[in-house]
């Protein structure tokens, strides 16, 4: 496991996608968290879409901004491949430019040195390769040569972002978003979990800094927990009751793995049904279950982050509920840290409140 350089201690962060159309407002909200991130704002521009951002300079790709479509042509890929390889050692090839994310560059303009850490994100090559199709509607991950280039390309983009963020804060980290990972466990997928594990492990090995994965879907949890990741971010509000029953979660924590518990719902109707007390009780139920299974409770608290359950672009009130969820998240974190004495210098209390 790679050291994060700070103690998680149930501090707050969040996934990247936000419903805002005001860049400065989105940044201000993101910066209220203990570990802020640069927001992805697809309602501002199609360039702010996480798939579009990841494909800047990838051979064979054309971005149709007017119709908001990504086009990939296999013959064009091979035509552009020699030129791409000529530029593959140039960091500029993998840099996220202002055209593809004005928000990212606004984030980098801020003074971020006083935060315990900062975070970035990039779409996983697995989810990207399953989402983008060629001219025959075939996912590009099914093409062996395209897949090989894609994994290397995203790996270099993650590393480039990590280096840029680290200039703003030495404890920066970047996690990969993997919303489509669950698809590889389907019998209908032409890209299965065996190949996926091989490719993912090789991809993770080449990442600089802490290696994190975020997802809101429900994959085979063993697949991730036994991989080479240092950080797992997931929707614990909906999936926590399942994942705590995996023995591999105990092993993950014992080897130093960090869990980001997505606990605060961002859908209006769900958030309205919850309170700080109910969310805290839900979390403590998961933690007590793990404690009974032999997970050291102090260690678990030290190695936990808290986050919203999911991103959300669907609420009728647009950003209002999401901003409320961030407020609730910060309040929940404060309550937990007070109860378990989670500071940078103190050992946390156990689940029953004892030192």
Task: For every predicted segment, state its role.
Residues 12, 35-39, 117-121, 171-175, ...:
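Structural preference for beta-strand elements that scaffold enzyme active sites
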Residues 117-120, 139, 143-247:
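Active-site loop segments of alpha/beta catalytic cores
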Residues 91-108, 144-160, 278-287:
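Glycine-rich anion/phosphate-binding loops
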Residues 1-142, 257, 289-293, 302, ...:
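Alpha/beta catalytic barrel-like cores
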Residues 230-342:
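Catalytic-face loop-and-helix region of soluble metabolic enzyme cores
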Residues 58-81, 193-218, 232, 246-250, ...:
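Non-catalytic scaffold segments within catalytic domains of secreted glycoside hydrolases
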Residues 131-146, 175-191, 263-273, 307-317:
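Active-site-proximal beta-alpha loop/turn segments in soluble metabolic enzymes
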Residues 343-355:
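Short, basic, low-complexity termini and linkers enriched in Ser/Thr/Gly/Pro
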